[in-house]
Every structure is written in C-alpha cells, then in structure tokens.
C-alpha cells in the first residue's frame, strides 16, 4: 500500500500518544484502582519512540532538536518527582531523558554507519552500549530498553517488512522491560503506527512547543490534584 494513502499523519500520532499518556497518568495518580487506564496508557510510549525516530530522521537541526528535549527533560523533573510523592529525588528520571538518549544514539549510529573509514563505524556499538547503560544507571522511565526501542524504529524505517520487525522488537521490549503482562498491550500501538502516512500534518512553533510543554504541565496538575484534592 502506498504510504500517502494512509490516514494518519504525525499530528494524529502525537495527539493519540498524548491522550493515552494522560489517561495512563490519571490512572497512576488519581484513580489507582482503574487498571484499564494503565492498560490504555501502554500505547503511549511506543508511539512516542516512533515519533522521536521520525524526528531524528527528518530534523534539519539536530542540536536544536536535542536541546529542546534536554530543556524539557530538566523542566519536567520537579513535576515528575512530585508525581511520585517527593519534592526531589535522583532515584528515577522522567521519560524525556530516555527519548533524548535514544535520539543521541540514533545520530551516532547513523554517522558511524555512513562513514567510509573503519574507525568511524566502531562508535556505533559504543554509543548503543553507553546509551543503554546510562539510561539504566539514571533509572529513566523504561530505561535502556526504551533507548533501544527508539533505535529500532529509527534503523528499520526504510527496511522491507519493517512493521513485522518492529512488532517483534516491540514484543521483546514488552517482555524485557516489565514483568506485568498488561505491558503487552503496547503491541496495539503498532496499529496506528502502521497507518502512518509519513506526513507532518498541521504544524507550527506554538504547537511544537505546546506538545513538549504538555508533559510537565499535565503531570504537575495531576500531582497537585493527587496530593491536595483527591
């Protein structure tokens, strides 16, 4: 099937990921017994990983792209800590750190593979190992497995039969990153990803930064509600 005939663009995927993430975090903070909300939320992370991989491939300014992720990762940390019931902790870091590490690994691997000299290819394995271990050490959301999931989407984006490879890779991710069987519902994220047409959809600076800001703003609001209202 021609990708251009598929119904979902990048904007649609972003909105779907945001809505499912919001439902997930509402379940985590306000309605801890509503397991269905956590199940719905399993779709969010794979879609975000896919979007980061697409962003890495199409951005015209890698430094600015990485800087945005870094700035919002730092800004999100206080709200993320509050969502976990503390004002400050270094025990667990928010998901934007995972996505940032994933993006950096993708670019290093891409650079290493396009290099003609052997020494240029060697950093690929090192970048993957460092990205994985750093995410594990920092205890970012989804850890090193999340970094590898971003890389999987990035490296297979032009591969024949990519949807099958991505589905299998996502299944391995679900098995490795969590003992909870509900994590397997993340496989459903491949349905909207399979319907992606490669187009950006409506975009603009305000909307772009609004998507980034949504993460710290919504978890801060939910955290305050959980602490002082519910």
Region roles according to the model:
Residues 1-230:
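Alpha-helical transmembrane segments and their immediate juxtamembrane cytosolic regions
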